[in-house]
């Protein structure tokens, strides 16, 4: 099992991120995506990989992590052009899958940019189609996609579960 925690540049609820970290940090690699590096800096996390065109991250924070990467040789930067066919988060997910990810936990994938939120939810389907378990977590939701039978466990703090078909015919047996 190879787990990744991706901290993207959307709205990050520090409580839900801390829950992800508590559950998965010891066995996971961490990828910061563009402005997600600000969250890493705020909570003192040194990511394994930093991906982005850095159009929304503080130049000072990016500079601090670049210096750290030169000294430590354990932080990988994936610099992207601002004109590209994929979002920064999409590139981070592709990077994790290329490294053999089996589970991906994403924080900061929802927020004020509806276009990015929708794109990120669509990325869950790409992960499911490739056999990778991927989850977007924020302070109100845990979102995933499945394309086969799955058992579901109750998560503490969540009272409801919704099933929404995405991209085709779905049958639900309860």
Language-model-detected regions and their locations in the chain:
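N-terminal beta-strand-loop-alpha-helix module at the start
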Residues: 1-67
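Non-catalytic positions within long, well-ordered alpha-helices that form the structural scaffold/packing
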Residues: 41, 97-100
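Short Gly/Thr/Asp-enriched flexible loops that form oxyanion-binding sites at enzyme active sites
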Residues: 111-125
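Short, glycine-/small-residue-rich phosphate/pyrophosphate-handling segment
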Residues: 117-118, 146-164
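General beta-strand structural signal in soluble alpha/beta enzymes
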Residues: 7, 31-34, 52, 78-79, ...
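Short, acidic/small-residue loops that bind anionic groups at enzyme active sites
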Residues: 126-143
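Conserved small/polar residues in nucleotide/adenosyl-binding loops
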Residues: 172-174
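Glycine/small-residue-rich loop that forms an oxyanion/phosphate-binding "nest" at active or ligand-binding sites
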Residues: 59-93
